[in-house]
Amino acid sequence: MRNFIIAASLLTSAAACNDSPGEIKDPPQLRIDSPARSTIQGKAGLVKVTGVVAPNEVSGEAVEKVLVNNVQATLNADGSFSAMIEVKPGATLITTTARDAAGSYAEDTRAIQAGELRKVGTMIDDALTASMSKTAFAKLSGAASTMIEHLDFMPILAPMQPMAHAGDEAGEDCLFGRMYVDNVSLANADISIVPTNAGLQFRAQIDGLDVPGHARYAVACVNGSNTVRVKAARVVVAGTLVVTPNGPQGFKTSLTGETVTITGLDIQASGIPGAVIDFLSLDKIAGYVISKAAPLAMEPMMNKALGGLAGPQSVDVMGKTLQMEVDPSAIDIDATGALITLNTKMLIKGTETSPGFIFTDNAMPNMEPGNGFALGIADDLVNQMMAEMKETGLMNLAMPATGGTFDNTNIAMSLPPMISADPADGKLKVILGDMIATYTDHGTPVAKAAINAAIELKVVPAANGYGVALELGKPTAKVTVMDDIANATRLTNEDLALATEGCLKGQIETISKLLVNIPLPAIGGLQMRNMKIGSDDGYVMLKGDIE
């Protein structure tokens, strides 16, 4: 049987896999003996490709040369050939081309994956990296101001109640006082977060602060209770905002070296004895509330801005449960901004029996954020997720066809998709290796082909522009019609190859639904602009501006 392959960029995403007969061509006969299709090996390095070529039975044209990934093979008189090619860590597509004297050619493309096999669901060190510039922190400050103005302070203050107390170390006795905050409101907030070599310089200016509450007390063994209200025209709290990793809970924030300045203090405590007011230090309560609540309010914002999840989470992906855990491992702050690294693991429930994913050791990428931000996503994280998706079986598709010589195409994944660097341009692409397409007519197999594709990665806005997500772009496919089943479709190998390409749409949709669940930074009120995608030492790199 003729072995023919066509490489083409898809210009359409037709759902059906149909085509019509074309002109029969007479390429040489080509058989690959090694490596086997869908090979997984433990390390990168040189791989020997062997096979046999012969003239086409009709044309009889002699085979002049054989190329394997553009490396000329040693071609023997009996038609056997061999070539040594370099396989790098990750996924590699091996294309063998045999060309005869008339210019006709036959091709075979197959995939090989090389590297350390690791169990799915394992923690990936430094899976996510993020850097924010000083300019980005200025934008973050504006978002923080808006957030504080609309913040419900009470859940934050609840564990601290009573907010002021004295004389109650042994319980409520003859001389004690306790003051509870009932609500916090304000007219305006101005937050400043500036990275310095000493940490994040934090300043919160609150105008029109109003803190109603109630007090319970006793003086000379006489108990009492009453309402109290503390107001201030302006409260300014400043200090160093300390952001530290807090395991699966994300980041923890606290304020050190704080200073508090209060202007226009008004304490309304009619009926409360002066002694109680004094030892409760109600004149300091306004500053105390802001100095404690404002830094804690920064915690969820920092988690969103820096990529933390504030605890393990589960999301639904095409009916499957994806469990995510992000553990910050380090945060380094200096006058230019901040660099954050996060360890991450993803596990789709029910895929624990997967053979695993190929792990490639990466160095830290260049995280220069410019005047905006930079994000790095390790290929290992995405490859782990795609190995799990393969194990679910959701990528094995049955696609009906009408009006042709076959009525259905069944696609089975023999290898998990992988992100790998394209040897031609160094860009990271998703490699779909050796997807096996079986064409059937009323349930009877009538042809078989192997699909190998490289798909561009794109970065797109998410969450209405307030976040970013990865998306698959335009694929380039190579389809090799296989000899396992005689081609009874009455289509040429070229036609069958073109028909098969349309089936990639389903695979792209499945992978895209998976990629959008990677937890990337998103800050309420700030939009990601001028997004660019690149690669650096095994990381997908996203860079852009914050507005």
Show where each model-derived region lies:
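C-terminal motif of bacterial Sec signal peptides marking the signal peptidase cleavage site
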Residues: S13-A16
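Surface-exposed, short loops/turns at beta-strand junctions within beta-sandwich domains
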Residues: M84-T92
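Short strand-edge motifs at loop-to-beta-strand transitions and within beta-strands
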Residues: G79-A83
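Edge beta-strands of extracellular beta-sandwich domains
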Residues: G103-G115
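Aromatic/hydrophobic beta-strand junction motif of beta-rich domains
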Residues: V49-E57
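Short, compositionally biased P/S/T/A/G/V-rich stretches that sit at domain boundaries
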Residues: D19-L46
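Extended, low-charge, aliphatic-rich alpha-helical segments
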Residues: G115-D207, Q268-E547
